[in-house]
Amino acid sequence: MVVDDSAVVRQVLVGVLNDAPGIDVIATAADPLLAIEKMRQHWPDVIVLDVEMPRMDGITFLRKIMSERPTPVVICSTLTEKGARVTMDALAAGAVAVVTKPRLGLKQFLTDSADELVATVRSAARANVKRLAARVTAAPLEAEVKHTADIILPAQSGRALAQTTERIVAIGTSTGGTQALEEVLTALPRVCPGIVIVQHMPEKFTAAFAARLNGLCQIAVKEAANNDRVMPGRALIAPGGKHLLLRRSGAQYFVEVLEGPPVNRHRPSVDVLFRSAARAAGSNALGIIMTGMGDDGAAGLLEMRQAGARTVAQDEHTSIVFGMPKEAIKRGGADRILPLGAMAREIVTQLQ
């Protein structure tokens, strides 16, 4: 079901989704109250939802859905500061993913973002609904060519390990990751290793996400800027639309934020971060791959393990989408498989 107050946007979204094999839009609605009437007749598997609508706002509607019958919800939001803030509230309320809303001149959306919408809806349809409900009560395909991390950080022969004792943590996640990261980071004490994070998310949304977490956590959380130092008690989140690399200067770590083609169809890419962590930190790193669709991060986690790092994959039971962790486990990249609730404790042990 598509719920949006713009008839033009509804028409475009429905056209894109109905053209995709295996997807059938059973209904549309101009506001949540109309949506509720239609859902009583036929409940959808996935809802694509605008968050700013008349009569009932999208957040209230989302909370109603999650309390009555948890259902995967994809937020379709505008690329504005206000839209980003509201979208963060929606993700906290149980939405599984966010896509950017098409603008009125819809050619660019049809060219650049249709595949992302379809992939996100398919990913949402596979979401662990029971886990979604438990959370509430308690990324983008950008290119046809699938690049590897080699295009950003070419593979090396031999191993160049870090000569430093400072510990760092690298985390990669996608669908369901905003809720997972909130659960992990809010459980951390002020004294913990420096953390670098890739969460698949459109540009302009990561700053609002980082600001929200910063207000909830004991540690500091910010959107990464080029040359930011990785410090104990602080987490840096890759900005949407940019790659994030870990670098080292002497005994200190810092990050590089750079442009470049999508890797595994994502920018930022988890593989890029993990490969850079393997090179910069070696055995002083902990790599964690969590809920998400696809295989981004699977190759990079294996590289981290081969460089001597401890590596962890989230288990299937607590993952919203058991795609990225499953692929990492399959390739031998994870030396441990842990539930989400054990991740914070695992991070703290990096200090020991």
From Swiss-Prot:
Phosphorylated by CheA. Phosphorylation of the N-terminal regulatory domain activates the methylesterase activity. GO terms for molecular function: phosphorelay response regulator activity; protein-glutamate methylesterase activity; protein-glutamine glutaminase activity. Its EC number is 3.1.1.61, 3.5.1.44. Contains a C-terminal catalytic domain, and an N-terminal region which modulates catalytic activity. The modification 4-aspartylphosphate is found at residue 50. GO terms for biological process: chemotaxis. Residues 162-352 form the CheB-type methylesterase domain. NCBIfam families: PRK00742.1, PRK12555.1. Keywords: Chemotaxis, Cytoplasm, Hydrolase, Phosphoprotein. It catalyses: [protein]-L-glutamate 5-O-methyl ester + H2O = L-glutamyl-[protein] + methanol + H(+); L-glutaminyl-[protein] + H2O = L-glutamyl-[protein] + NH4(+). It comes from the Bacteria. The keyword Phosphoprotein applies. Belongs to the CheB family. Pfam families: CheB_methylest, Response_reg. Residues 1-116 form the Response regulatory domain. This is Protein-glutamate methylesterase/protein-glutamine glutaminase 2. It is an enzyme of class 3 (hydrolase). The lineage of its organism: Bacteria, Pseudomonadati, Pseudomonadota, Gammaproteobacteria, Lysobacterales. The active site is at 174, 200, 296. Its main location: cytoplasm. It is found in: Cytoplasm. Disulfide bonds: none annotated. GO terms for cellular component: cytoplasm. It comes from Xanthomonas euvesicatoria pv. vesicatoria (strain 85-10) (Xanthomonas campestris pv. vesicatoria). Involved in chemotaxis. Part of a chemotaxis signal transduction system that modulates chemotaxis in response to various stimuli. Catalyzes the demethylation of specific methylglutamate residues introduced into the chemoreceptors (methyl-accepting chemotaxis proteins or MCP) by CheR. Also mediates the irreversible deamidation of specific glutamine residues to glutamic acid.
